[in-house]
């Protein structure tokens, strides 16, 4: 196992230090493992929400590492009710929170997908949406089962739900109860979703310090489902959450008998106690989130003050193989995303616990950001940071949060939620020079006070971006860009962003192979799609030939003009140093002709 603490060298000048994150996913969503159960927003009442906001402010003031830099004067930011975005990303649908999930304190949380359905967590339970038609999604079920934060995953006929707030029991009729009471319960719940519109509760497993998040890893023989449970912030006053807590919990669910789910191990990840904290870095007392890559027997953990790699070839006994720290800019290691090849990891820093306005010039571009690491010889090698450049208002919580890959062959592109900073699509194919290629943003929920809101999770699923907004419910967005359109051909039956699948790259073009229309291949470092049946015709040899180049961008993140590619009105390209926008359908017409299809952009 390797352990390195490093201070980064950056391309941007340093900014005022904005300190460590709260030991909770959301500062204003205080969980019972860290505070008393009285703060649990189980009913979403104005009184409960106000108490949480006051408590979050007090928590920030009480922690020496939580001294926030003064906010810069917000300029050119959206007003409440306004929206904005890049022309290649369209917001096409929204289903507001409703029923018992409507109150402000009932936060919408994570997402999982299966078939035509999206399963959306909420502090009050979970909702099932039919997203087969992304422009007209429908709510088809709502399950009331309180217990924040209801992190959610699906696998086959099973749905797994996390509870990280102390409850009176493991039923869905529970109420908040202090973690200081031995009989209180936290852990995971298992539901049968063989009928997705009518889930049935079948099992529960109590875990130490509850289950803030969880990740799935099916056994190699396909007979069991292993659940890696992440939790943190032990307290000597809590009988079931005693310090030290340098471990995760592993739950095994027999797929032929899910009611027999049980805790099988509690691997010690930090025998030396992990990051001791200080200098703006969080003290490690467990993990916030683990992302598995089951086909590669690999996982990445975001563990408060540490980022780790794990070998999960023995599913019940994962082993840490690499540890890295960033004591200069990372306050709270929150989540991780691999690239498709498993040769990179994007870690997120949830500075301020998700409840603070950190997207402004005072905080700067390197705190509350993503950090891109290459995996070289099993070691994590820092390459760069990525953070949205749009300034957000002082009443908008904004920091890097949950996202997923967009399966573009030959490129590393992800979509990501930034709370009230909106949604960003960005390319990290060049690890040292990430670039944004699309975005969507709403104005603040209020100009007078910070209401915790924005996109908790934004993921790509079968051609659409689906987001769960903390206050405004389910959003669907459609991305139309020549850089990413190849991803629309990738269809999956199931998707849990924290259990990454492997997307199969197109095969290399072969002169002797016959290709039907729609087939994709790689050739000359690019991805090509056959427009019709072809054999023996080299991609790129003839601009009017059967092959259309569908993936490839320049260093600025805009697609370079290619003669073989089909462009439609609104598409942007670069050509000889100038950016152009198509005025109508075009192919093999080079930009530069004032009477042609391309409009130069100043």
Predicted regions and their residues:
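A residue-level detector for conformationally permissive "hinge/kink" positions
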Residues: 21-24, 413, 465, 485, ...
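Sec-dependent signal peptide recognition
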Residues: 15-19
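N-terminal secretory signal peptides that target proteins for export/translocation
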Residues: 1-13
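Tryptophan-rich substrate-binding surfaces of secreted polymer-degrading and adhesive proteins
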Residues: 501-602
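Feature marking well-ordered beta-strand scaffolds used for ligand recognition
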Residues: 2-4, 20-22, 29-31, 40-505
């Amino acid at each position: 196992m390797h352990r390195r603490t490093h201070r980064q060298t950056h391309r941007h000048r340093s900014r005022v230090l904005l300190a460590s994150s709260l030991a909770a996913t959301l500062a204003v969503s205080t969980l019972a493992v860290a505070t008393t159960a009285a703060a649990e927003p189980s009913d979403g009442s104005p009184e409960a929400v106000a108490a949480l906001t006051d408590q979050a402010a007090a928590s920030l003031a009480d922690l020496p590492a939580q001294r926030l830099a003064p906010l810069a004067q917000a300029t050119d930011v959206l007003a409440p009710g306004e929206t904005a975005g890049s022309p290649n990303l369209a917001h096409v649908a929204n289903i507001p929170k409703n029923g018992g999930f409507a109150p402000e304190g009932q936060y919408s949380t994570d997402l999982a997908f299966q078939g035509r359905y999206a399963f959306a967590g909420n502090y009050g339970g979970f909702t099932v949406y039919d997203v087969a038609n992304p422009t007209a999604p429908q709510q088809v079920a709502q399950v009331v089962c309180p217990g924040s934060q209801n992190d959610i995953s699906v696998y086959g006929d099973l749905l797994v739900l996390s509870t990280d707030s102390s409850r009176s029991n493991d039923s869905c009729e529970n109420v908040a109860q202090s973690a200081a009471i031995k009989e209180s319960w936290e852990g995971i719940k298992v539901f049968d979703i063989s009928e997705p519109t009518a889930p049935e509760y079948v099992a529960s497993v109590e875990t130490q310090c509850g289950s803030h998040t969880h990740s799935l890893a099916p056994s190699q023989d396909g007979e069991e489902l292993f659940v890696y449970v992440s939790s943190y912030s032990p307290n000597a006053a809590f009988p079931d959450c005693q310090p030290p807590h340098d471990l995760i919990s592993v739950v095994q669910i027999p797929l032929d008998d899910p009611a027999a789910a049980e805790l099988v191990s509690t691997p010690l990840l930090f025998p030396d106690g992990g990051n001791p904290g200080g200098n703006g870095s969080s003290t490690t007392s467990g993990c916030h989130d683990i992302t598995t890559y089951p086909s590669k027997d690999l996982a990445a953990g975001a563990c408060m003050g540490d980022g780790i790699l794990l070998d999960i070839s023995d599913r019940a006994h994962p082993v840490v193989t690499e540890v890295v720290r960033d004591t200069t800019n990372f306050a709270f290691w929150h989540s991780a995303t691999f690239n498709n090849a498993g040769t990179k990891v994007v870690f997120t820093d949830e500075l301020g616990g998700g409840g603070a306005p950190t997207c402004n010039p005072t905080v700067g571009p390197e705190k509350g950001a993503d950090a891109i690491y290459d995996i070289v010889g099993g070691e994590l090698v820092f390459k760069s940071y990525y953070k949205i450049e749009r300034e957000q208002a002082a009443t908008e919580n904004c920091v890097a949060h949950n996202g997923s890959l967009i399966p573009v062959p030959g490129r590393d592109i992800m979509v990501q939620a930034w709370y009230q900073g909106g949604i960003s699509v960005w390319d990290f194919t060049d690890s040292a020079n990430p670039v944004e290629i699309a975005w969507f943003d709403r104005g603040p929920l209020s100009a007078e006070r910070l209401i915790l809101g924005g996109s908790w999770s934004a993921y790509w699923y079968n051609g659409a971006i689906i987001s769960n907004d903390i206050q405004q419910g389910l959003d669907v967005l459609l991305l139309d860009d020549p850089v990413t359109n190849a991803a629309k051909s990738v269809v999956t039956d199931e998707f849990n962003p924290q259990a990454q699948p492997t997307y199969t790259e197109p095969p290399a073009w072969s002169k002797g192979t016959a290709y039907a229309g729609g087939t994709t291949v790689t050739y000359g470092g690019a991805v090509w799609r056959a427009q019709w049946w072809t054999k023996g015709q080299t991609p790129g040899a003839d601009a009017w030939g059967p092959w259309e180049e569908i993936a490839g961008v320049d260093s600025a993140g805009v697609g370079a003009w290619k003669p073989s590619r089909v462009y439609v009105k609104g598409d942007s390209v670069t050509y000889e140093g100038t950016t152009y926008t198509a005025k109508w359908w075009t192919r093999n017409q080079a930009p530069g002709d004032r009477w042609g299809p391309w409009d130069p952009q100043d």
